[in-house]
From Swiss-Prot:
NCBIfam families: gln_syn_GlnII. It is found in: Cytoplasm. This is Glutamine synthetase. The lineage of its organism: Bacteria, Bacillati, Actinomycetota, Actinomycetes, Kitasatosporales. Residues 3-82 form the GS beta-grasp domain. It comes from Streptomyces hygroscopicus.
Length: 340
């Protein structure tokens, strides 16, 4: 029986990478071979040396095609099998391995916005604006919710693929939604997030809309779209002092700027200090504070153990990058203080 394997990879588009995919027919799904592609057509190579390599790193059932068909997430390599500069997964791998003993795990909240043409779904066609933000967040009813049928289909597809989704909800702006992935280790949560994003774009195709990860899809008094990143280590899940250490590590010296510069395109447009954000150029942390850079959830403060939420990453952040930065910054300081 022939198997359709959809090879998925992250391209070299700047400033925000896009997903690409193509189908390989296999006689046996137990072995996923390397494959190649034209990097000159994906912003990853020039025409005179355009061959690049797809290295399978994660696979799951293809919930769209069904049967034994597969989705295959790949790293991009040069023909000498060294990582391509666009391959951010290769940079995460050694960091994840170095700090694996601290058992870091992540839950990432992926916000996104459905667009019909260049306007959010739910905005009046032909111009104008809907009612101000108030009733849309976790709302119900045709006057508040736009695109639920797409969201539900995406959720079903992700679960059928075995991805680690943990929930969905409507967000603050019309046509804006969120799904959550995790809690999982850094490589796994990032792999699952990229495949879930691919499925989101793929199912949106069928409904004639675009699933945008733009950080500020509607200018003015409308919420932006983020990827709030929840993080803990074993020590943080067992005590409060390591939680404070992690929060302080993220604010040390030039760490705030180092992080936000890599937290997605359009960070200054979204992190303004309004709409449940902290200013992009100021660092803060606090319990239950959605206006802080990093939030300590209320139950964590009460129980004196748990996790933290970095609220700065944009919806278009690369999960391989944000997990690498947080593991490196927090786990290095936790190790220095022997809070492991």
């Amino acid at each position: 029986m022939s198997i359709k394997a959809e090879y998925i990879w992250i391209d070299g588009t700047q400033p925000t990478a896009k997903l690409r995919s193509k189908t390989k027919i296999l006689s046996d799904g137990s072995r996923l071979p390397r494959w190649g592609f034209d990097g000159s057509s994906t912003n990853q190579a020039e025409g005179h040396a355009s061959d690049l390599v797809l290295e399978p790193v994660f696979s799951c059932p293809d919930p769209i095609r069904g049967g034994d068909h597969l989705l295959v997430l790949c790293e991009v390599l040069h023909t000498d099998l060294t990582p391509h500069p666009s391959n951010t997964r290769a940079l995460l791998r050694p960091v994840a391995e170095r700090f694996a003993g601290q058992e870091p795990i992540f839950g990432i909240e992926q916000e996104y916005t459905f667009l019909k043409g260049d306007r959010p779904l739910g905005f009046p066609e032909g111009g104008g604006y809907p009612a101000p933000q108030a009733d849309y967040y976790c709302g119900v009813g045709a006057d508040a919710i736009f695109g639920r049928e797409i969201v539900e289909k995406h959720l079903d597809l992700c679960l059928a693929a075995g991805l680690g989704l943990s929930g969905i909800n409507a967000e603050v702006m019309p046509g804006q939604w969120e799904f959550q992935v995790g809690a999982l280790p850094p490589l796994e949560v990032s792999d699952h997030m990229w495949v879930a994003r691919w499925l989101l774009h793929r199912v949106a195709e069928e409904f004639g809309v675009t699933a945008s990860l733009d950080a500020k899809p509607a200018k003015g008094d409308w919420n932006g779209a983020g990827a709030h990143t929840n993080f803990s280590t074993r020590a943080m899940r067992e005590g409060y002092d390591p939680i404070i250490t992690a929060c302080e590590a993220l604010g040390q010296d030039d760490k705030p700027l180092e992080h936000v510069r890599q937290y997605g395109t359009g960070i200054e447009d979204r992190l303004t200090g309004a709409h449940e954000t902290a200013p992009w150029d100021a660092y803060s942390y606090g319990a239950s504070d959605r206006g802080a850079s990093v939030r300590i959830p209320w139950q964590v403060e009460v129980e004196k153990k748990g996790y933290i939420e970095d609220r700065r990453p944009n919806a278009n952040v690369d999960p391989y990058v944000v997990t690498r930065l947080m593991v490196d910054t927090c786990c290095t300081e936790l190790a220095r203080r022997e809070q492991i």
